[in-house]
Amino acid sequence: MTWFWKPQPAYRSQFKAEHVNILASMVRRNYPSNHRFICVTDSPEGIDSSIEIVPLWNDFATIPSPHGRLFPSCYRRLKAFSAEAREWFGDRFVSLDLDCVVTGNLAPLWDRKDDFIIWGDTHRTSPYNGSMFMMTAGCRKQVWDDFNPSTSPAITKAMGYLGSDQAWIGARLGTLEHKWTSKDGVCSYRNQIATKGGALPVGARIVFYHGNVDPWSPQAQSLKWVRDNYHL
């Protein structure tokens, strides 16, 4: 499943329904097991009819990032950790950010049996990156239950963690959860590709663009491996 809501006008990335449709197509091509593709959104127009729509809730919608209003605020995603998530997503689900390119078979990543696993090697001071996580619904409901909009963002900032929801996940769960890393083929465009001439790492299965470049940006589209994979 993925998330699509209209970002603030000044935010670095502007997402579209087309990006939801492309992500669903990449997943279908690279994950052979039977699955549903779900989008949690407040803007279903233009999303392909094969994609299930879950209406986006307003919980924590107005809480700004503790790093400033030009930084993304994704606290709404914390509701995926609630016990209610099973009603929307089923017993087991993967959460994916839109700004990624799937480049290989996802089964070795998603057929694991860990009750919770999250991407986790993108910044030395932050244990996790919320661009992708997989869980058995409700298995870490304390992430949702214990979030206090008045105090939790400040706690994560004081700990030196980056981000909004991902920072709280780290603060509440600690640093010892199972992680995907580049050794599993989960790669960072900013950290592992842009700094090395744009070459796709050997064994890469999925590449995330957690930064100023998106898969649809001219810089990314200049790379053949992006064009070969990022399409309907």
Question: What residue spans do the PLM features occupy?
Answer:
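GT-A fold catalytic core of metal-dependent nucleotide-sugar glycosyltransferases
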Residues: 45, 55, 59, 75-127, ...
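Residues that flank catalytic or metal-binding motifs in active/ligand-binding sites
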Residues: 33, 49, 77, 96, ...
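N-terminal anchoring/stem segment of glycosyltransferases
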Residues: 1-66, 88, 137
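Conserved catalytic core of nucleotide-sugar-dependent glycosyltransferases
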Residues: 103-173
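Short, hydrophobic beta-strand segments that form beta-sheet elements in well-ordered domains
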Residues: 33-42, 92-100, 116-119, 179-181, ...
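Short, charged, surface-exposed secondary-structure boundary motifs
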Residues: 11, 15, 62-69, 125-133, ...
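Catalytic core and acceptor-binding pocket of nucleotide-sugar-dependent glycosyltransferases
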Residues: 141-232
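Short, polar loop motifs at secondary-structure junctions
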Residues: 38-46, 102-107, 184-185, 211-213
